[in-house]
Amino acid sequence: KKEKKIKGIIHLAAQVAVTTSVINPLNDFNVNALGTLNILEAVRNYCPNARFIYSSTNKVYGLLNTVKIIEAPKRYEINKKEGISESEPLDFHSPYGCSKGCADQYVLDYARIFNLQTVSFRQSCIYGERQFGVEDQGWLAWFIIATVLGRKISIFGDGKQVRDVLYVQDLVELYEKFIEQGNNLNGKAYNVGGGLKFSLSLLEFIDILKDQGLEISYTFGDWRPGDQKVFVSDNTKVIKELGWEPKTSPVQGIQHIVSWVKKHRELLSSFMSD
């Protein structure tokens, strides 16, 4: 075998929808768990000095049954001042949570056993332009696309569920930081999101869209399996060890996507019809 000179690898490929994983759990496992193991083996054999980033998920923490959840008028809140930290017990829910969690653990173990330079970023909701969000995945982009195109939206649950949202350019800066500066961070997991400051519920998100002059039509449906009532990332560890913080507020990021969707209305109409 011949070693390749590769500086960094960012593993983003995945089956991304909880609902799809319930319909076809074997395919979900093959893509997320086995697929990640295949990539780790390739790194081990051909580029063991490359820095490897795994795009993991907050779903590895499950329904957060150990966390006290408080219901407010427009959102759920938790009794943790900074959000959910990496010390929260892992508790995979849904086939998607299991497959991503399995891959997450392999990524960390390959650092321990084979001394690879791997990290797992347990990401909350990532959003930005060029995100072709659909009902099952990419909810923030999906809401905007559907609203601009005059489509009705389904809210699964009561709309009070909360996520911290992270603009994609902020995430890219973190990836670059790790590849350039990530010394002695092998085998670590980091919660990565917008944090409490950049969190919002679905109902609060709808209010932001209305403030931007958009008319939105929606209905309510049943909760989906594995859907957390609230998840907010505690970014303390990644801030301390990599010197990174999210910069783009939800209002700013949403404005960027609304502008992009309006500019590419015809393309997105074709995508929606498919």
Language model regions located:
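Glycine/proline-rich active-site loop of Rossmann-fold NAD(P)-dependent oxidoreductases
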Residues: G101, F114-Q117, I126-W142, L149-R151, ...
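Generic structural signal for alpha-helix termini and adjacent loop/cap motifs
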Residues: N24, A42, Y46, A146, ...
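N-terminal Rossmann-like NAD(P)+-binding domain of SDR-like oxidoreductases, especially those catalyzing
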Residues: K1-I126, W244, Q255-H256, K263-H264
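C-terminal "lid/loop" region of Rossmann-like NAD(P)-dependent oxidoreductases
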Residues: D158, K188-N191, L203-I206, D211-V230, ...
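Residue-level signal for the nucleotide or nucleotide-sugar donor/cofactor binding architecture
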Residues: I23, V31-L34, S87, S94, ...
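Non-catalytic, hydrophobic alpha-helical segments
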Residues: L171, Y175, V192, L202-F205, ...
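Amphipathic terminal alpha-helices
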Residues: P250-D274
